[in-house]
Amino acid sequence: MHALPYKGDRMSGLLINNSLVHYETFGRGQPILFIHGWLGSWRYWVPVMDLFSIDHRTYSLDLWGFGDSDKSRERYDVDSYVELIISFMDELGIWRAPLVGHTLGAAISTRLAARYPDRVSKVMAVCLPLNADYINRKLLTAGSNDALARLFWQRQHPYPEVESSLPKMAHNAVALTIQAVARLDLREVLEEIEVPLLTVYGGKDPVVDPSQADELEGNHYSARAIVLPDAQHFPMLDEPARFSRLLRDFMDVETAEQLQELSVKKEWRRRTR
């Protein structure tokens, strides 16, 4: 894929296959790449990116069909997004990095780690649906973005970071990406992943069933599954301190033994230089 730098009035971007990819980056240090999910854009990662920017170079992009990235595509599928992320990393000189993905972003991250193991050092997959059985069935049949958004907010207050991005989504992006993930059986993908894999679920998530954490742990995948009991579909916004502490601890994980020892800490304090 050929990419060229792009500078809009107030944003950074790349042209990949003649399609704009908007991204933002904070901080200096080792890279971490954050990938958003079905609803919203890069913006809801800002609080976590800011916390980690003290000692990492944090990146997040708008996937095609979302935010300020290109919306001219007729199809939005996981494998195309995998190639998009690889091209994005290539153009920014990121050879290998941890991936932190949410729902759609979690599916992309796990698929990418299985296909390109040399490019990923570890994966945090947040609210990862293993297959269609773990996705709220109403999401699979709701058509418009507005109808889907109402399902997301049935049991929790909308977040401004997410709500502000809704008008910018392609009219069919949410439905098509939900269907794309639902067609996959990610249990097969997880068996191919060799790097540390942490899955995180919200215990009160109305969108992705958190009970699959038991299946992940019970079937001895090379993964650790942790449930944040009071979180819903956006754990990074519902419980930001616990989520950030968990991610910080995960960044230090190098072995399977360390991965299994991970647990949720009650407090997280920002490190100082």
Model-derived features with residue positions:
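Conserved alpha/beta-hydrolase "acid-adjacent" motif
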Residues: P206-Q212
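Active-site loop/oxyanion-hole signature of alpha/beta-hydrolase fold enzymes
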Residues: Y59-V100, R245
